[in-house]
Each structure stands twice: as C-alpha cells, then as structure tokens.
C-alpha cells in the first residue's frame, strides 16, 4: 500500500468523527479543543469540508490561526473529500500539515486499535444550478486549486485494486465516507432532489450509481472478511443510526455533529 495513504497515530487516545463543516474550520477547532476540551484526539471530518471555495492562501491562513490550539491539545484533524471539496486538494496537491491534512480516497487511518478506511465523494444534487451560477469557472489544468463552486469529478469511485492492496495489510473495522450505501437514510427523493431532477435529466441515475459504489465497497469488505463494525457518513444534513443483521452500526451525522468512536474491544 502507498505509504502516503496510511495515516498512523500511535499517540492518539481518542477518535471523533464530524459531519459536514462547510468551511467552518475555526468553529470546528473551537468546538473540539475548547468547548469539549478534547485532547490526544484524531478528529475526522466526513466530507464537505469546504476546500476550494476560497483561494489556497485562505486555507493556509486558517491552519496557521488554529495550529497552536491543535498542538496544545495534541489533536489532529483529517478531512475526507465531499462533493463540496475540490478533489485537487486530495489528489494532486493534498494538504499535509502535521495536525491538519486532507485524506485521499482509499486511505487508511490507524489509531486506538482501529483500522479505518476513508473513501470520499458524492453527487451535488444542485450541480445544474452551480454550473449556471456566475461564480462557476471552467477548470484550468494549470490552476488545479483555483477558486470555484463545483467540481465535475466529485463522485465516488469503486477501486478494487486499492481495496485488494488494503486487504493485504489491514483488517478494516470502520469506514468513513461522505455518502452512504443505498439502504441507509436518506432514501427519500423528495424536496430539493425532486426539484433539481426536473432540470438535470441524469441526476437520478448518477445518484443511484453513487450509492451503488458504497454498496460495492460494503460487499467487498464483508466478502473479504474484514471485521467491519462501524460506518460513518455525512452529506444528508440529518442524524440517524441503525444496526444491520451483521452487527454493523451505520451513523449518519448532521452538520457539525460529533460522534466518538470508542477504543476497539
């Protein structure tokens, strides 16, 4: 497995997963480090972090503003890719600060006895609106981090080769994604989705495919005997939890909702 997609935290004493933060980086750091007084904790944001809506320097300034607080608390923040994140921050030019890093798809986080698979991406149901907005810019190859409001390569991808490589070295017990398997909430296709599907004729099929990618990842992990017990995701801006017949607990996290992943038994 590529060492750049292994994130190892032997010092960590806790793991917390956050729902979407939509650019509220300062609020997340304050909530974790000050409001809840977390220490020695790996904090993983399940997508829609907000990378790409501002210039690159903005995110460096945010990090510089918060790194002292993170260091003092001995906390680390990892950012999984959502549909509202420029994939270039995860592929071509990932952020690699000691306590603040973007996590490429099919990375493994190892902490507190857990081996956690992270796979980002989802479909923006309002993509047609975003592409017609004056703030939308066609991507330029020589400016991968240029400010924008939509990225066409936002969708999740099933990669059997990467899963095979992961299976050689790890036993995945937890997965963090942005979207979710097809049987998880939300399953309703009303509201904004129904409105946007009228204008975007491919939306229904693309969202179906997005959820099926998650189904395929689940099928792979279970059929290859990974000890999967927890699945965390964001994207839908609501909170929900359920346990399936195999004992896997699915956790949908609302915006800025935090949930602790306990130490492995």
Q: Which functions belong to the PLM regions below?
A:
Residues 11-16:
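Extreme N-terminal starter segment of soluble prokaryotic enzymes
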Residues 1-8:
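A short, compositionally biased domain-edge/stem linker segment
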Residues 17-19, 43-48, 76-84, 102-104, ...:
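Active-site neighborhood of phospho(di)ester-bond hydrolases with catalytic His/Asp-centered motifs
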Residues 24-26, 52-54, 86-90, 109-112, ...:
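Short catalytic/ligand-binding loop motif for oxyanion handling, primarily in non-cytosolic enzymes
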Residues 18, 23-112, 207-211:
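Core catalytic region of metal-dependent phosphoesterases/phosphodiesterases
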Residues 9, 110-112, 216-224, 236-265:
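Binuclear metal-dependent phosphoesterase catalytic core
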Residues 35-39, 167-170, 225:
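Glycine-rich phosphate-binding loop signature in dinucleotide/nucleotide-binding domains
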Residues 114-212:
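Active-site-proximal loop/helix segment associated with metal-binding centers of metalloenzymes
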């Amino acid at each position: 497995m590529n060492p750049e997609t292994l994130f190892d935290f032997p010092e960590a004493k806790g793991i917390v997963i956050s729902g979407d933060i939509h650019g509220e980086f300062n609020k997340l750091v304050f909530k974790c480090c000050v409001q809840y007084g977390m220490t020695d904790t790996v904090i993983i944001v399940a997508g829609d972090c907000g990378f790409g809506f501002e210039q690159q320097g903005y995110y460096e300034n945010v990090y510089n503003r918060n790194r002292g607080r993170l260091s003092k608390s001995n906390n680390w923040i990892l950012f999984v890719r959502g549909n509202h994140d420029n994939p270039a921050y995860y592929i071509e030019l990932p952020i690699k600060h000691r306590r603040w890093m973007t996590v490429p798809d099919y990375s493994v986080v190892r902490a507190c006895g857990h081996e956690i698979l992270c796979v980002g991406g989802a479909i923006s149901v309002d993509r047609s609106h975003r592409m017609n907005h004056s703030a939308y810019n066609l991507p330029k190859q020589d400016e991968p981090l240029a400010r924008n409001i939509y990225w066409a390569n936002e969708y999740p991808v099933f990669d059997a080769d990467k899963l095979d490589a992961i299976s050689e070295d790890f036993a995945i017990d937890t997965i963090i994604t942005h979207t979710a398997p097809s049987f998880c909430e939300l399953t309703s296709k009303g509201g904004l989705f129904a409105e946007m599907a009228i204008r975007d004729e491919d939306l229904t099929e693309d969202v179906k495919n997005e959820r099926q990618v998650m189904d395929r990842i689940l099928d792979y992990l279970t059929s290859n005997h990974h000890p999967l017990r927890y699945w965390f995701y964001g994207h839908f801006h609501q909170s929900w939890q359920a346990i399936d017949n195999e004992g896997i607990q699915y956790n949908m996290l609302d915006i800025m909702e935090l949930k602790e992943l306990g130490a492995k038994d």
